[in-house]
UniProtKB/Swiss-Prot annotation:
Binds 2 magnesium or manganese ions per subunit. Disulfide bonds: none annotated. This is D-alanine--D-alanine ligase B. The gene is ddlA. It comes from the Bacteria. The lineage of its organism: Bacteria, Pseudomonadati, Pseudomonadota, Alphaproteobacteria, Hyphomicrobiales. Pfam families: Dala_Dala_lig_C, Dala_Dala_lig_N. GO terms for biological process: cell wall organization; peptidoglycan biosynthetic process; regulation of cell shape. Its cofactor is Mg(2+); Mn(2+).
C-alpha cells in the first residue's frame, strides 16, 4: 500500500480507495477501530489504500504505516506531523497539500470510503464535500445521511410512513422540558434521554426520577443542542439487521442478530459496546419465530427506503413479545471486530472482503448515475 494514491500494476491499475477515519466527533475512537478492520478486509490485490485521518479539530492528514497505521493494528492512528491535505472541489478525487508548498499535488483517489461515525462525518457534511469534489464514495449521500443522523427527523418520517416507533419527544437547550411534563406526555416515569445527533450510545442515560432526568439532560446537552426523550421499554429485546444496496439498486436484508447485554449494564451503553469485553453478547442468528424474523427484514428494507439510505445501513429494532418498534438506522455502522453489520453479512454468507467489493461497486455505479443527470 502507498500513502499517496497507489501505483500502476503491469496487469491493471488498482483502484485507489481513500479511507477516511477519525473525525471531529465523540465517536472518533470507534471510527479509528472501524478503519483498521476495513483496511484488513480490503483486497490488496485489487485496491491501494490512501489513509486519510481526520483529527479531532477537523484537519485532514495523509497517514501511512509510518504514522502507526497498519493491517495489524486494532485502531489506526493520526499524527499531526503527517502531511495536511485537502480535497479539490470538482477535482474528481484530486488531493493537494495544505502545508508546505500549499496547493501542491498530494495524489488522488478513485473512491472514498468514509468510516466516520457521528457528527461531521455521518451526518451529510463529509458526503457533501465528496459530492462537490465529484468523487465516488461509499454509503448514503447527503440526504440519507442527514435524515438518518437526526433521531427526531428520522422518527417523524418513520412514524408518518406508518412504521412503528417508540413514543418520544424532543427538547432543546433553549426550551427545556420538565420531568413531570415528559412523564405526562410519554405515560411513564421510566425514560431514556439521548443526544439527537449522535451514535454509539454516547451521551445516553436512563432516568426514573426528577434528579436523574436533570442529570441525564445535562449529559446529553454536552453533545447536542437538541435531545430526544423516549419511553423506556422494559424487557425489550434488541434486534439488528444489516441492509445492503447492490450496484444495480437491488436492496437486500441480512439475517438477524440479537444484542444481549450483561446484567450489570442497565442498557446497551458505550461502556457495554466498546470498553467492557464482556458487556454484551451477540447472538447470530437471533432466536425469533420465522414469520416475525421475515417481518423484521421487510421492515429494515422499508426503513432504508423511507430514510433515503443508500449503499448500506444497519437497522435496529426493539422486540417486546409480538410488538416490534424501529429504533434507528445507522448509515455508517460500526466495522470494528465486534460490530454487528459485517458479522451479520458473514453469517449470511458474504465475507467482509466481498462486502467491501459490493460497497465500492455501488459507490461507482451511483456516481455514474449522478453524473448522467443534467445540471445545466
Amino acid at each position: 500500500m502507498t500513502a499517496y494514491g497507489g501505483e500502476m500494476t503491469k496487469e491493471r491499475r488498482k483502484i485507489t480507495v481513500g479511507l477516511l477515519f477519525g473525525g471531529r466527533s465523540a465517536e472518533h475512537e470507534v471510527s479509528r477501530a472501524s478503519a483498521a478492520n476495513i483496511l484488513r478486509a480490503l483486497n490488496s490485490d485489487r485496491y491501494d489504500v490512501y489513509l486519510i485521518g481526520i483529527s479531532r479539530d477537523g484537519r485532514w492528514f495523509a497517514c501511512d504505516s509510518g504514522n502507526g497505521a497498519g493491517t495489524g493494528s486494532t485502531a489506526l492512528t493520526i499524527s499531526d506531523e503527517a502531511p495536511e491535505i485537502g480535497l479539490v472541489p470538482g477535482g474528481r478525487g484530486r488531493l493537494v497539500h495544505c502545508d508546505g508548498p500549499t496547493g501542491s499535488d498530494a495524489g488522488s483517489i478513485d473512491v472514498a470510503f468514509p468510516i466516520l461515525h457521528g457528527p461531521n462525518g455521518e451526518d451529510g457534511t463529509v458526503q457533501g464535500a465528496l459530492e462537490l469534489a465529484d468523487v465516488s464514495f461509499v454509503g448514503s449521500s447527503v440526504t440519507g445521511s442527514a435524515v438518518a443522523m437526526d433521531k427526531e427527523v428520522s422518527k417523524r418520517l418513520m412514524r408518518d410512513a406508518g412504521l412503528p416507533v417508540v413514543p418520544f419527544l424532543t427538547t432543546t437547550a433553549s426550551s427545556r422540558i420538565e420531568y413531570a411534563a415528559a412523564v405526562a406526555a410519554l405515560g411513564t416515569p421510566d425514560l431514556f434521554v439521548k443526544p439527537a445527533n449522535l451514535g454509539s450510545s454516547v451521551g445516553v442515560s436512563r432516568a426514573r426520577s426528577e434528579e436523574e432526568f436533570a442529570a441525564s439532560c445535562a449529559l446529553a446537552f454536552r453533545y447536542d443542542r437538541k435531545i430526544l426523550v423516549e419511553q423506556a421499554l422494559n424487557g425489550a429485546r434488541e434486534i439488528e439487521c444489516s441492509v445492503l444496496e447492490e450496484s444495480t439498486g437491488d436492496i437486500r436484508a441480512s439475517g438477524l442478530g440479537e444484542i444481549v447485554r450483561a446484567s450489570e449494564h442497565g442498557f446497551y451503553s458505550y461502556q457495554a459496546k466498546y470498553i467492557d469485553a464482556d458487556g454484551a453478547a451477540l447472538h447470530i442468528p437471533a432466536d425469533l419465530p420465522l414469520l416475525q424474523a421475515r417481518r423484521l427484514q421487510e421492515l429494515a428494507v422499508e426503513v432504508f427506503n423511507v430514510l433515503c439510505c443508500e449503499g448500506m445501513a444497519r437497522v435496529d429494532f426493539f422486540v417486546q413479545g409480538d410488538e416490534v418498534f424501529v429504533n434507528e438506522a445507522n448509515t455508517l455502522p460500526g466495522f470494528t471486530s465486534s460490530s454487528m453489520y459485517p458479522k451479520l453479512w458473514e453469517a449470511s454468507g458474504l465475507s467482509q472482503t466481498d462486502l467491501m467489493d459490493k460497497l465500492i461497486a455501488h459507490a461507482f455505479a451511483r456516481h455514474e448515475r449522478r453524473r448522467a443527470l443534467s445540471f445545466g
